[in-house]
């Protein structure tokens, strides 16, 4: 089980939001690259970046901070990024800068042809971010609920050739209420590509619960507010996940 620290970028700073509300941002660091180094030193094997301004603006907005993070740790571990990615040129530029994966969310739902083109042009580097509430997909920085069922879109995007799916329960994100295990497993069973859980991770019990269903196709989990607030010790959580994996393999 891959535990992936999230670095959410707003105005060049590392922040956390509550349920995607830009007005409810807590600043955790004014040096995102230093924060990236911190998580790598704590044992992170991948980083998850979100350009929050970009997600709302529909185009990249925190490129300096993103490049600084890639320069700091991109040679050591994979770095993935979502937010404001709406065209192939942006994807190409980010991959050339050293990103390992780009995450397409709203644009995949609104313009499936773009996702299909991205998967064709940059195979192995495209992750789809599906954000949902009560099984319905949300777009535009979570501000709009669609009528699309998560599993239906996931199967469609799998056919396009995306690498994996990040599934975020937006009713829980930033609320420390626990991962929606049931919904995540349901999605993982609907597709053959890996699913990464997101939204609500709060403690070691969540890690244990996820590890129990890892073989359903759940590759990892995004770690957000809990590792910043101190509710979850990241290094201890990754160690626990590794130990549980080893005991399962034994």
UniProtKB/Swiss-Prot annotation:
PANTHER family: 1-(5-PHOSPHORIBOSYL)-5-[(5-PHOSPHORIBOSYLAMINO)METHYLIDENEAMINO] IMIDAZOLE-4-CARBOXAMIDE ISOMERASE
Pathways involved: Amino-acid biosynthesis; L-histidine biosynthesis; L-histidine from 5-phospho-alpha-D-ribose 1-diphosphate: step 4/9
GO molecular function: 1-(5-phosphoribosyl)-5-[(5-phosphoribosylamino)methylideneamino]imidazole-4-carboxamide isomerase activity
Keyword Amino-acid biosynthesis: yes
Keywords: Amino-acid biosynthesis, Cytoplasm, Histidine biosynthesis, Isomerase
Gene Ontology CC terms: cytoplasm
Subcellular location per the Swiss-Prot or TrEMBL entry: Cytoplasm
Keyword Translocase assigned: no
Family statement: Belongs to the HisA/HisF family.
Residues at the active site: 8 (proton acceptor), 131 (proton donor)
Gene3D superfamilies (alphabetical): Aldolase class I
Full protein name: 1-(5-phosphoribosyl)-5-[(5-phosphoribosylamino)methylideneamino] imidazole-4-carboxamide isomerase
GO terms, biological process: L-histidine biosynthetic process; L-tryptophan biosynthetic process
InterPro entries: Aldolase_TIM, His_biosynth, HisA_bact_arch, Isoase_HisA-like, Isoase_HisA-like_bact, RibuloseP-bd_barrel
Catalyzed reactions per annotation: 1-(5-phospho-beta-D-ribosyl)-5-[(5-phospho-beta-D-ribosylamino)methylideneamino]imidazole-4-carboxamide = 5-[(5-phospho-1-deoxy-D-ribulos-1-ylimino)methylamino]-1-(5-phospho-beta-D-ribosyl)imidazole-4-carboxamide
Stored CDD domains: HisA
Enzyme class: isomerase
The enzyme's E.C. designation: 5.3.1.16
Coarse class of the protein's main subcellular location: cytoplasm
Domain of life: Bacteria
């Amino acid at each position: 089980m891959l535990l992936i620290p999230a670095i959410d970028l707003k105005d060049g700073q590392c922040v956390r939001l509550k349920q995607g509300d830009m007005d409810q941002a807590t600043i955790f660091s004014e040096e995102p690259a230093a924060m990236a180094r911190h998580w790598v030193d704590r044992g992170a094997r991948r980083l998850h970046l979100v350009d929050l301004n970009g997600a709302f603006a529909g185009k990249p907005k925190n490129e300096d901070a993103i490049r600084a993070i890639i320069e700091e740790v991109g040679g050591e571990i994979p770095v993935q990024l979502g937010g404001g990615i709406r065209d192939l040129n942006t994807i190409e530029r980010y991959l050339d800068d050293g990103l390992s994966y780009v995450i397409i969310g709203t644009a995949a739902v609104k313009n499936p042809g773009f996702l299909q083109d991205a998967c064709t042009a940059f195979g192995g580097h495209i992750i789809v971010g599906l954000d949902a509430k009560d099984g319905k997909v949300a777009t535009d920085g979570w501000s709009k609920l669609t009528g699309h069922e998560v599993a239906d879109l996931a199967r469609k995007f799998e056919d396009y050739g995306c690498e994996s799916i990040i599934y975020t329960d937006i009713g829980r994100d930033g609320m420390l209420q626990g991962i929606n295990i049931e919904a995540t497993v349901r999605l993982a069973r609907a597709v053959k590509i890996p699913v990464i859980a997101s939204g609500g991770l709060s403690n070691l019990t969540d890690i244990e619960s996820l590890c129990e269903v890892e073989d359903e196709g759940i590759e990892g989990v995004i770690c957000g507010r809990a590792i910043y607030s101190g509710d979850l010790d990241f290094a201890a959580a990754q160690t626990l996940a590794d130990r549980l994996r080893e005991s399962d393999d034994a």
